[in-house]
């Protein structure tokens, strides 16, 4: 449904943007996929990752992800709590279509900072909002403003290497 009916291509779009932003990345030692779902988000990245961890709330989705052999370890639970308890440092943090289910991103970005270092890459998608901070939409998903995202990235010492607006999915047949 996600790929066929909604023309969903966010993981591949994010990977292309990431590749375009960096000349050569080599292989990442430790990567974490926040809201990994069925593994759709991690599949474009996993070949360049030595140790790949996926986190998701849905045990059913993690069962599907496990069958794809993308991740070395899967964690079932709340992303904020899982990140808070994580002991490893990650050089790549991925989150595709997860922050749309979280309004205030300050706590999760702070927890992401705790598992990263200066050289880490944090790549993610959000739905764009042209207002202040964030908004809960009729779809039940949140949109976040660029200024809000930039502010909490700055607070947590992340620099924006690239930012791009694109269509992630069709909504009722429209982009």
Give each language-model segment a name:
Residues 119-127:
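Conserved beta-strand signature within the Rossmann-like core of class I S-adenosyl-L-methionine
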Residues 2-16:
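Conserved SAM-binding loop and adjacent beta-strand
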Residues 98:
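Hydrophobic adenine-recognition pocket in adenosine-nucleotide-binding enzymes
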Residues 132-147:
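Acceptor-substrate binding/catalytic loop of class I
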Residues 94:
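A conserved beta-strand element that flanks and buttresses the S-adenosyl-L-methionine
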Residues 32, 38-82:
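Class I SAM-dependent methyltransferase SAM/SAH-binding core
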Residues 106-118:
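A short glycine-rich, Lys/Arg-flanked "PGG" loop and its adjoining helix->strand segment in the class I
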Residues 158-168:
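Conserved S-adenosyl-L-methionine
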């Amino acid at each position: 449904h996600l790929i066929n009916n909604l023309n969903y291509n966010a993981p591949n779009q994010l990977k292309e943007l990431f590749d375009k932003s960096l000349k050569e990345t080599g292989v990442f030692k430790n990567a974490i996929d926040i809201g990994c779902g069925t593994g759709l988000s991690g599949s474009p990245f996993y070949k360049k990752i030595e140790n790949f961890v996926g986190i998701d709330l849905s045990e059913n989705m993690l069962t599907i992800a496990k069958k794809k052999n993308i991740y070395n370890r899967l964690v079932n639970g709340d992303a904020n709590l899982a990140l808070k308890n994580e002991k490893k440092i990650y050089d790549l943090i991925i989150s595709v279509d997860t922050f749309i289910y979280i309004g205030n991103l300050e706590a999760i970005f702070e927890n992401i900072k705790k598992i990263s270092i200066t050289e880490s890459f944090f790549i993610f998608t959000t739905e764009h909002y042209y207002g202040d901070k964030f908004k809960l939409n009729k779809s039940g998903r949140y949109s976040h403003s660029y200024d809000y995202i930039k502010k909490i990235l700055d607070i947590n010492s992340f620099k924006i290497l690239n930012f791009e607006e694109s269509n992630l999915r069709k909504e009722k047949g429209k982009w």
